[in-house]
Amino acid sequence: MNKIYIILLTVFFYANVYSQQAYFVDGYHGGIYGHYPVKWKTQFVVDQLAMHPDWRICMEIEPETWDTVRVQTPEAYLRFKEMATSNQVEFTNPTYAQPYCYNISGESIIRQFQYGIAKINKHFPGVDFVTYSVEEPCFTSCLPQILKQFGFKYAVLKCPNTCWGGYTAAYGGELVNWVGPDGTAILTVPRYACEKLEPGSTWQTTAWGNSDAYLKDCRNAGIKHPVGMCFQDAGWKNGPWLGSGKNTKNNSIYITWRDYIENVSIGKTDDNWYFSQEDIHVNLMWGSQVLQKIAQEVRVSENRIVMAEKMSVMAYLE
């Protein structure tokens, strides 16, 4: 009889552990100047959304892309316009050119958001911007203040599938308060302290595919609502990243970041993370010498634009 009780308790324990619900944030990232195959991509996205009503995506597409989409594939554009404000879609990075924010000035970052938001809202007037999330490490320590000024409520510091460009330090649990240098805080999903780099890899963390090992580490770390993510390159002809229906990996539920933070996560935290530039472990991929030079030239150019604007204002006032 004792053996039976032990067996039943063991089964109950493991059933309880593995019944913990996993979540996954899917989406696309790219743009007209990088990888967005205009001739077929938008039609493919709307078809996939219609085919998989339980699928959710976050969009990180360079805003100017929609100018070309509207001209070259107008029917697909109009269909996506109808879906853009549905619960299946969230726009998470409206910056004009998806900059690696750590190498440009705060004024340049503000312009990236200002121009990008205006362009997206020109195409999709009903879209709002609540969560900042990116596929590549487009982070800098001053973002909380800038995000709050543009009406964002939440941020995400994960970039599990593009760590060759860099990644944030692993810290905390389900949620943290990301505190900027000026003291502004924004509720954030971090790269968990238990979210490791994949074995033998410097370009992925374990959160990229909701693997058994990742979910187990989350459970052991006390994370009640584990979530992974991958914003697929827009050039890939692939729908739901983890599969669909009964074939979805580890029974993960697709969700947008806004829905996850507001309706699934613990919702708040007392864990204040004073995030600095040193917590962004970055690298210039695809040839560091060439890209280092490009980054320097970008910074010089953007600084000159700001200087020219200031001189123009001073001349006008005189």
Task: Describe each model-derived feature in a short phrase.
Residues 3-15, 19:
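Sec-dependent N-terminal signal peptides
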